[in-house]
């Protein structure tokens, strides 16, 4: 996949992505009915990977116009009809969506943006009860942040500076 040179763009490392999708396939062996969203799509690697593994629908949200154009070119090159690309602010876009819209949500904002907590707040109502939320951070995530959003880590790992977690909603 071609990558546009954008300041602050930090694609998920291949090793981390392989681990993540191994976890997802273990927890959700059949993705054929899954709907996914990547709130800070960047290169789109996570969303395109989810689509390639059979997800029914994947939405990529990105605010950077250069990246949106690149995502659109990649979608057409791959003939990935199950992918929707939305240009805009992820928090504003998701505010308009109905509850329980997604089985898989990717939240990987720029590390120092302060967007992780607001994104978790915005998506708490969007995830289905058995859904998965992936977060990627530059520092270990605080358990209090997860508890506030009624999430628990199903799997966690780190590779270098990248800390990554696959979260599930707590039962009501």
Residue ranges and their predicted role:
Residues 1-172:
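Class I S-adenosyl-L-methionine-dependent methyltransferase catalytic core
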């Amino acid at each position: 996949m071609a990558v546009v040179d954008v300041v602050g763009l930090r694609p998920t490392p291949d090793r981390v992505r392989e681990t993540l999708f191994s976890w997802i396939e273990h927890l959700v062996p059949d993705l054929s009915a899954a709907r996914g969203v990547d709130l800070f799509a960047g290169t789109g690697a996570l969303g395109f990977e989810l689509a390639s593994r059979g997800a029914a629908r994947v939405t990529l949200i990105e605010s950077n116009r250069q990246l949106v154009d690149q995502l659109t070119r990649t979608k057409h090159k791959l003939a990935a009809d199950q992918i929707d690309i939305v240009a805009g602010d992820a928090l504003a876009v998701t505010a308009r969506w109905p509850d329980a819209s997604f089985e898989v949500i990717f939240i990987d904002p720029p590390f120092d943006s302060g967007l992780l907590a607001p994104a978790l707040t915005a998506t708490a109502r969007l995830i289905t009860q058995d859904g998965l939320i992936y977060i990627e951070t530059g520092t270990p995530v605080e358990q209090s942040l997860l508890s506030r959003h009624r999430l628990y880590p199903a799997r966690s790992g780190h590779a270098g500076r990248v800390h990554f977690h696959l979260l599930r909603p707590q039962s009501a």
